[in-house]
A protein has these predicted regions:
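ABC ATPase NBD Q-loop/coupling interface
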Residues: 1-9
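Q-loop/switch helix immediately C-terminal to the Walker
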Residues: 13-16, 20, 25-42
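Conserved ABC ATPase signature
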Residues: 59-68
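Catalytic Walker B motif of ABC-type/P-loop ATPase nucleotide-binding domains
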Residues: 84-88, 93
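Helix N-cap at the start of a conserved alpha-helix in ABC-type nucleotide-binding domains
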Residues: 95-97
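Hydrophobic anchor residue at the start of the ABC signature
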Residues: 73, 112
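Conserved ABC ATPase "signature" region
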Residues: 43-58
Length: 143
C-alpha cells in the first residue's frame, strides 16, 4: 500500500500524544477513560487502567502535571494504533510514571508498533532500535 495513494487511509493507524495533556475540566480520570473507551471502541477494563497508572479519584482540575500526563498516557492503551507520534512523553512524570510509560511503550513495540518521538531524554529511547533524525549540539535529539 503506497502512502501517496490515499494518505487519509493511514489516519486510523496513527495515534498522537502531545506535550500538553488536553483533558476536559471537571471530570475525573475514570470519567475521561470511560469516554475514551467508548470513542476508541476499546474492551480495556477501566479499573485496570486506573490501577496501572495509579490515577486519583478527583477531577483533573486538581491533578498535578504528572497525574495529568498519566491520564493522557492511559489513552495510548485504548487507541489501538500501529504508529505513535509522541511529543515529550516522559516530561513531568516521576520515576514510577516513567517506568509505567516504558512498560506500555515496550508492549507497543513488541506487538509490531512503531513510535516517532520528540524528546529531551534520548538515552531511554536508545535502548530500542532508533533512527536519529537530528542531534542537537548538547547531545539532545532534535527534529
Amino acid at each position: 500500500n503506497n502512502l501517496s495513494d490515499d494518505p487519509s487511509s493511514r489516519q486510523e493507524e496513527i495515534g498522537y500524544y502531545g506535550h500538553k495533556a488536553s483533558l476536559q475540566a471537571g471530570l475525573t480520570p475514570t470519567e475521561i477513560i470511560k469516554y475514551w473507551k467508548k470513542y476508541y471502541n476499546s474492551d480495556a477494563i477501566t479499573s485496570d487502567l486506573i490501577k496501572f497508572w495509579d490515577l486519583p479519584n478527583y477531577t483533573v482540575d486538581n491533578c498535578s502535571e504528572g497525574q495529568r500526563k498519566r491520564i493522557a498516557l492511559a489513552r495510548l492503551s485504548l487507541m489501538k494504533r500501529n504508529i505513535w507520534v509522541l511529543d515529550e512523553p516522559t516530561t513531568n512524570l516521576d520515576a514510577v510514571g516513567k517506568e509505567k510509560f516504558w512498560e506500555l511503550h515496550t508492549l507497543h513495540l513488541k506487538s509490531g508498533g512503531l513510535s516517532i518521538v520528540a524528546t529531551h531524554e534520548p538515552a531511554q529511547f536508545e535502548r530500542n532500535k532508533v533512527i536519529i533524525l537530528a542531534r542537537h549540539r548538547d547531545n539532545e535529539l532534535k527534529c
